[in-house]
């Protein structure tokens, strides 16, 4: 049995499931999402993604949570270790100081053993 690609998805992927103003991104995202629904990928979602979704306005927020409910995913939470790694990414110049959220996503994906981050 072939190992599934383990992907960490960021908020923008879920958001682009309903993006009529960006039909190209929406079409690409829908194709990817279909693979997630059929189990082609092992999907990982970080707690920062959930927090970002909570900040969205209705009806978009409900739509995105409903979409997440249609795929299997592993939820990973921010830990002291992920904070430390995110700080190192920024401290070493891998990301700008204002890139704290991106660093958090990357650190979580790293600790979760993801093969790719999809954004």
Where are these regions (language model features)?
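Short, well-structured N-terminal submotif of metal-dependent ribonuclease cores
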Residues: 1-45, 54-65, 91-92, 96
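Extended, non-globular alpha-helical segments
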Residues: 63-67, 74-77
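Active-site neighborhoods of divalent-metal-dependent phosphate/nucleic-acid chemistry enzymes
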Residues: 73-118
């Amino acid at each position: 049995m072939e190992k599934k690609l383990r992907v960490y998805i960021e908020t923008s992927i879920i958001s682009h499931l309903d993006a009529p103003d960006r039909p190209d991104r929406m079409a690409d995202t829908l194709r990817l999402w279909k693979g997630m629904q059929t189990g082609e990928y092992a999907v990982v979602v970080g707690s920062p993604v959930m927090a970002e979704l909570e900040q969205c306005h209705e009806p978009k927020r409900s739509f995105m949570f409903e979409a997440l409910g249609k795929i299997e995913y592993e939820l990973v939470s921010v830990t002291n270790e992920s904070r430390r790694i995110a700080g190192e990414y920024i401290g070493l110049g891998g990301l700008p100081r204002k890139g704290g959220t991106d660093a958090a996503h990357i650190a979580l994906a790293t600790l979760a053993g993801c093969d790719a981050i999809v954004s």
